[in-house]
Amino acid sequence: LGALVPRRIENLLAANKNIGTTHITNGCYRLHPVEWNIGEAAGSLAAFALDTGRKPKDVVEERGLLRQFQRGLLADGVPLSWLLDVPVGDPRFDATQSLVMAGGYGEGTGALEFGPDLAIGPDERSRWTAVQWVVT
């Protein structure tokens, strides 16, 4: 989301090929499905900023506002993370997406599967219960 919000210019959102990226990651961002997702994210962020009277930069920088924005996306069925085994419509979709976004799963692993039917161990259980997801 931070790639859409310029550091020095207020109330401007980048979308599509003009987002803040490097030459290394640009190979991913130039693909049409990713461009469409970037456009959807920019439009959703603009609408959220207008609805809340806040600047897009505030949403990126304030954790509570970011979580509020993310909850709205989840309510609309927009995935925040690519989990191949917990698709939109799965009753566990919101919970698993929220856990990933709050840093309770997959951080730094690049995992595309959540494994919702697998048992978890005590270490993983304690890490999950420690996750802070802003509710208000």
Spans of features found by a protein language model:
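FAD-binding beta-loop-beta segment adjacent to the flavin cofactor pocket
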Residues: L1-G27
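Secondary-structure capping and boundary motifs in well-ordered enzyme cores
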Residues: R8, L31-I38
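Glycine- and acidic
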Residues: G20-H32, A49-G53, G106
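Composition- and surface-driven signal marking solvent-exposed, interaction-prone regions
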Residues: T25-R30, S44, K55-E62
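Internal hydrophobic alpha-helix adjacent to the cofactor/substrate pocket in enzyme cavities
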Residues: W36-K55
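Sec-exported extracytoplasmic/periplasmic mature domains
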Residues: A47, D51, L74, V78, ...
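Non-catalytic terminal regions with compositionally biased, polar/charged low complexity
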Residues: L50-G89
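Short, solvent-exposed alpha-helical surface patches in non-cytosolic proteins
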Residues: D90-G103, T109-T136
